[in-house]
Regions:
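Conserved metal-phosphate-binding beta-hairpin within the catalytic cores
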Residues: 10, 51-85
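A general structural signal for well-ordered alpha-helical packing
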Residues: 41-44, 58, 72, 76, ...
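Peripheral (often C-terminal) accessory segments that flank ATP-dependent C-N-forming ligase machineries
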Residues: 95-192
Length: 192
């Protein structure tokens, strides 16, 4: 099916949605910004209520380019990187630690900057040459890992962890197709 890809992340407790975020998606989406889709929000609320589920839920959707319909194409009962949309929201922890005390649905702040992975954006710039788009993304967003007060995770991921993984694949002769900085792994051919 061809069309627009969308993703959500939700925390539910006994059928009630406690936290919710959504975004435009793509394979290995590495840039996150809340889009506040009313249609998807209603779908997630209805699903959680009807199933009385508790836990973390990640849904992927496709809006068909042929009929305009929204189709739910995947559900993963786990944390998703869409959770990064809450990077500046202090209330998210409450959904995990004290779900019964959550009074209203926790959503990313409307003025929250989108999240990106810097080296992914550099590769995008080098492969597309879209300087204005790159600058807009980098200047208006925040890096998922970099924090000026604690740069070690950023340095460790990009200059130690990923290079060691690449060297391992080169040394063992295992072919790879991409580096996924979001989850800190080298995706091998035939892998996920």
């Amino acid at each position: 099916m061809d069309g627009e890809e969308l993703s959500t992340y939700a925390i539910a407790y006994k059928g009630r949605v406690l936290a919710y975020a959504d975004n435009e998606a793509s394979l290995s989406c590495l840039s996150y910004g809340h889009i506040e889709s009313k249609e998807i929000w209603s779908w997630v609320q209805r699903f959680c209520k009807e199933t009385e589920c508790s836990g973390q839920l990640c849904f992927d959707y496709m809006r068909s380019s042929s009929d305009g319909q929204l189709y739910s194409i995947e559900c993963n009962p786990r944390t998703s990187t869409v959770i990064t949309e809450f990077h500046d929201h202090p209330g998210l922890a409450e959904a995990f630690t004290d779900p019964e005390s959550v009074q209203s649905v926790i959503k990313p702040f409307k003025n929250s900057p989108p999240v990106y992975w810097f080296w992914n954006e550099v590769v995008t710039l080098l492969t597309t040459g879209q300087v204005r788009e790159w600058w807009r993304e980098v200047s208006q967003g925040v890096d998922a890992v970099f924090d000026p007060s604690d740069p070690l995770p950023f340095l460790g991921l990009h200059y130690m962890h990923v290079p060691v993984l690449l060297l391992r694949n080169i040394w063992t002769g295992r072919p790879w197709k991409k580096i996924d900085l979001c989850i800190g792994k080298v995706v091998e051919l035939g892998g996920d």
